[in-house]
Amino acid sequence: RFNETVAVSQYEEGALRYNAEEKAEEFRKAEEYNKSISGQDVQDPFLPGSGAVLPDNYEEILDVDMGMMGTLEIPCIDVVLPVYHGVSEEVLRKGVGHIQETAFPIGGEGTHAVLSTHRGLPEARLFTDLDMFYIRIFDEVLAYETDEIQVISPSDLSQLKPEMGKDYVTLLTCTPYGINSHRLLVRGERREYVPEVKEEIQARTVHTERYMLAGITVLILVVVAMAGYSTYRRSKKRTGKKTGKN
């Protein structure tokens, strides 16, 4: 989590260096890219040799700092992850990757961006049990509400195609843990960004974590007390036996 936090901070600092005209130009280039790859088949990022020939400038578009194009925030599990260009092994080890054959996650009708990560990493948080998630590109925040979760075969990625009039972002990862024979898709549909909604989710998450921490603390105290009482009983029995012998 520390490295992810540092990367997110680097992105936020880098985004501040762009003025309004420069940001508008980056969005324009991203929109052009999205139009150019419309209708292109999506390749499974976890299969060796997958991928398509892409424009030479792909990694330059929306590149704020060190290959990062934005951040993904999932308030219900209290996590913010950096989003990088591409889905190389190196990228997936340190954050979320953008599948190149899909739209840049800048929103817009008829777009379907796909982001991927390694579900199996011990320190990774799962893309499950989501409610709302948020994409930040520069200072623009896009809100998505989970509307579909499904498990598919890696040979059938037709669900990742864009739909007319829809604005989707799908989070893709391997499943089940340790086997990785299928793909878990968590799709979100664009909603109006309301900061108060995100704050409410964050507050709910904090309360839940506090209750869990309190419960764990009580459980530990009970276990310690039981262990102490058991030790006391054994010690008392030994003392009683010695007294009886005397």
Model-identified regions with their sequence ranges:
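C-terminal single-pass membrane-anchor helix
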Residues: E200-N246
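Solvent-exposed, non-transmembrane regions of membrane-associated and secreted proteins
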Residues: R1-Y211
